[in-house]
């Protein structure tokens, strides 16, 4: 291992220690999923996600929705968050509108809420960098 590789690895480990200095005190709680939001009925009425998801396991159905949405939503890291962060508003703003890109947080929000509307357990997960010099993060949907 050369000096640059050693220094990079050192910085990653420094970041791990820095980001995990302390833990939130308190007791563990169960994750709760709300699949009964009134807006979900509007979402399924306006967009054909039930037909797109089709039949099969939750994962198979979620993958079909993902494959449908992916080419229809443009990614933009410069999206400023001016649209309400819910699937209905974000789809109205960005679906099939390449000039209206949204960031990963909002793309994950759309997939999460569509899945919940379909009765598929889903949640957003944020990935934070371990390097103390990297301020970028990423958000995905976990099924």
Model features per residue range: what roles?
Residues 68, 72-75, 106-111, 118:
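Long, hydrophobic/aromatic-enriched structural stretches that serve as scaffold segments
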Residues 2-102:
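Secondary-structure boundary elements
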Residues 100-104, 125-127:
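Short His-Asn-centered micro-motif
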């Amino acid at each position: 291992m050369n000096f640059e590789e050693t220094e990079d690895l050192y910085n990653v480990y420094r970041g791990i220690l820095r980001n995990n200095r302390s833990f939130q005190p308190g007791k563990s709680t169960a994750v709760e999923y709300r699949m009964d939001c009134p807006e979900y009925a509007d979402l399924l009425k306006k967009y054909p996600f039930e037909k797109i998801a089709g039949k099969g396991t939750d994962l198979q159905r979620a993958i079909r929705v993902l494959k449908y949405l992916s080419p229809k939503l443009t990614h933009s890291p410069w999206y400023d968050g001016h649209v309400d962060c819910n699937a209905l508003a974000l789809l109205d703003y960005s679906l099939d509108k390449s000039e209206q890109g949204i960031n990963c947080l909002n793309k994950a929000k759309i997939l999460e809420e569509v899945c919940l509307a379909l009765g598929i357990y889903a949640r957003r997960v944020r990935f934070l960098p371990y390097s103390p010099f990297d301020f970028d993060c990423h958000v995905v949907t976990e099924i």
